[in-house]
Design a protein with these regions (language model features):
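Solvent-exposed, non-transmembrane regions of membrane-associated and secreted proteins
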Residues: 15, 22-26, 32-259
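N-terminal intrinsically disordered, acidic low-complexity segments at the extreme N-terminus
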Residues: 2-21
């Protein structure tokens, strides 16, 4: 070690000497403090190791296995959605809705009919976000089993077309991680939600990181909007990231049986 390095080490020791002296003095007066600090240090180290081990396990095992499972579930959901798109238009309620003159009112009637058709875990539509290369089938419900199939519609929020805030939750890791790049959305990006009765086009307003307990983000506002939520940051559930988008237009409204 060179002379300058020895001098630097000596200066460092001198700088920390008062701190070390105060620590030693505190330990002498409070014998239990040293043990407490050691326990706290060990606990922090263990916590860090557990977090790193969980991330490693996710990358090495859960990601590929759950992605395979997610792919199978998406394939099943695609078939289920195709069946729904074929059967829903032929229902008696849709035939009656076809006679409604007002386009806006017709969308509302169709949406109300649809909401009574679906059940938890069932495929209900498709979410398409070109800017992050997302095209995924969404399901009804945000329980664990539903989210393993794809993004899930918050059942306490209305369907697109019923007015207010429509919200979906999705994974950012595992099970194909459909919302992995939610943080890359920018104001102006387009989101399409394709339902069996109409297609709803939204434009992103922005994103925000919130606490998991912040349910205010899915509350009703004065206009029709879409909210997408996911855990944040990656490999952690300590926070949530939410993307907000305002409804721009409604198209491809179901005309009736066969239309």
């Amino acid at each position: 070690m060179g002379g300058r390095s020895l001098i630097a080490v000596a200066k460092s020791r001198m700088r920390w000497a008062p701190v070390r002296a105060r620590y030693d003095e505190a330990v002498r007066h409070h014998p239990g403090m040293h043990r407490l600090l050691r326990v706290a240090s060990v606990a922090l180290i263990i916590a860090g190791v557990v977090i790193l081990a969980d991330v490693a396990a996710t990358l090495a095992w859960r990601e590929p296995v759950s992605s395979l499972y997610g792919s199978i579930q998406q394939h099943k959901a695609a078939s289920e959605l195709a069946d729904l798109e074929a059967s829903f238009p032929s229902s008696a309620g849709v035939r009656r809705a076809a006679t409604v003159k007002s386009r806006h009112r017709k969308v509302g009637v169709l949406t109300d009919l649809f909401s009574n058709w679906v059940h938890e875990g069932q495929a209900i539509g498709r979410i398409v976000i070109p800017s992050i290369d997302l095209d995924v089938i969404a399901v009804q419900g945000t329980d664990t089993a539903s989210l393993e199939k794809g993004p899930g519609h918050y059942p306490q929020t209305p369907f697109p077309g019923q007015g207010g805030t429509t919200a979906f939750a999705g994974h950012r890791t595992t099970y194909l991680a459909p919302f992995r790049h939610l943080d890359q959305l920018r104001a102006g990006d387009v989101i399409e939600v394709e339902m069996p009765y109409a297609t709803f086009t939204y434009r992103v307003q922005g994103t925000r990181v919130v606490a998991p307990s912040d349910i205010g983000i899915i509350h009703r506002v004065s206009y029709d909007r879409l909210v997408l939520t996911a855990c944040h940051p990656l490999y952690s559930a300590s926070e949530r990231i939410a993307a907000f988008a305002k409804l721009q237009r409604v198209s491809d409204v179901l005309a009736g049986p066969g239309g």
